[in-house]
Amino acid sequence: MTVQQYLSYIVNDIHRTIVATVDDKGLPVTCAIDMMDADENSLYFLTAKGKSFYDRLIKREFLAFTAMKGEDTMTSVAVSVRGKVRELGFDKIPELFEKSPYMKEIYPTEESRRALTVFQIYEGSGEWFDLSKKPIERASFAFGKAEESPEGYEITDACIECSSCLDVCPQNCIESDSIPYAIEQEHCLHCGNCHTVCPVGAVTKR
């Protein structure tokens, strides 16, 4: 999937997200926010200027969120994003209301909508995690000027082919037909079992 496809999936297939920001004491605060639009490099949402959520966005200019879709754990897809935000103001409100017409029931009059403002997540990174696939499927992406930050584990040239890692990998995602062994990153849970059991320290964090 392309970055735009990930962002569009958040808006069109999930929509409701749980957003985390930080308060004045440095403590996390969460709230439910609908992601209402996306383009090739950003996401858009709105909030009211009177909310404490608005104050936190203005002060920190950063957020993180997770969006989930599925009937239960084993049918779920989760997309997590963290990134920089900026306020765009009122101009995009009519467009977002047309794309999410239920908002007209919450803010029914033009006057009531004057409290609203649009924010853009213009730079960030994200992760796709699909538990409905066997083996699981994961991918990372970045947008704006952000770069992907590799996570998980890799096997170095110190590998001695002892197969200890193969025995403890819950997704059987370690390839053993080459030296050193290789982790299939798109299926890895990042559980760290391979790192823990390797007798020669050949498994390192990326």
Regions from the PLM with identified roles:
Residues 9-28, 63-67:
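A short, Trp-centered hydrophobic/proline-enriched beta-strand micro-motif
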Residues 33-37:
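A short, well-structured catalytic beta-strand-centered motif of the EAL phosphodiesterase domain
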Residues 40-44:
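Short active-site oxyanion
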Residues 51-53, 72, 135-136:
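Short, surface-exposed beta-strand-loop junctions and turns on beta-sheet-rich folds
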Residues 55-119, 123-125:
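Short, structured beta-strand-loop surface elements
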Residues 116-118, 123, 127-168, 172:
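Ferredoxin-type iron-sulfur electron-transfer modules and their immediate structural context
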Residues 164-181, 193-206:
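Iron-sulfur cluster-binding cysteine motifs and their immediate structural context
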